[in-house]
Amino acid sequence: MMEFGLSWVFLVAIFKGVQCEVQLVESGEGLVQPGGSLRLSCAASGFTFSSYAMHWVRQAPGKGLEYVSAISSNGGSTYYADSVKGRFTISRDNSKNTLYLQMGSLRAEDMAVYYCAR
């Protein structure tokens, strides 16, 4: 299995009331029927996006964080949790500093808040 360093940076990181320079802003919220599909995007700024592996995690209502997927800095290597393998596809566009998660064959248990992380 690949080794991905993960420093939990979600959305706009706030530390001791001071806004950090690193920003990860997700988009792609939607109401989807079971079996449907949805693409999430994460626009990154404040760091050299192409130098970092990137990650998706999620949190279902009333539950803890669940690791979903990761992609290496150049996009050549990917990892998926067993729960999403074969249904979700992670990708990135380093020229746009953007991370994506294409989600397909959606199930009720996929309902969650999704976060991108560096």
Curated annotation (Swiss-Prot):
Segments carrying the region annotation (Complementarity-determining-2) are: 71-78
Residues covered by region (Framework-3) = 79-116
The biological processes this protein is annotated with in GO are: immunoglobulin mediated immune response
- List every stretch annotated Framework-2: 54-70
Superkingdom of the source? Eukaryota
Region of interest (Complementarity-determining-1), residue spans: 46-53
Localization annotation:
Secreted; Cell membrane
UniProt-annotated stretches for the region Complementarity-determining-3: 117-118
Gene3D superfamilies under this entry?
Immunoglobulins
Positions of disulphide bridges: C42-C116
Give the start-end ranges of region Framework-1: 21-45
Residue intervals of the Ig-like domain: 21-118
* Pfam families for this protein: V-set
Keywords, ordered alphabetically = Adaptive immunity, Cell membrane, Disulfide bond, Immunity, Immunoglobulin, Immunoglobulin domain, Membrane, Secreted, Signal
The yes or no answer to whether the keyword Cell membrane is present is yes
Which positions carry the signal peptide feature in this UniProt record?
Answer: 1-20
Q: Provide the Gene Ontology terms for cellular component.
A: extracellular region; immunoglobulin complex; plasma membrane
One example GO MF annotation: antigen binding
Record's function text? V region of the variable domain of immunoglobulin heavy chains that participates in the antigen recognition. Immunoglobulins, also known as antibodies, are membrane-bound or secreted glycoproteins produced by B lymphocytes. In the recognition phase of humoral immunity, the membrane-bound immunoglobulins serve as receptors which, upon binding of a specific antigen, trigger the clonal expansion and differentiation of B lymphocytes into immunoglobulins-secreting plasma cells.
Q: How does it assemble?
A: Immunoglobulins are composed of two identical heavy chains and two identical light chains; disulfide-linked.
From the Swiss-Prot or TrEMBL record, give the protein name: Immunoglobulin heavy variable 3-64
Q: Give the originating organism.
A: Homo sapiens (Human)
Tell me what gene encodes this. IGHV3-64
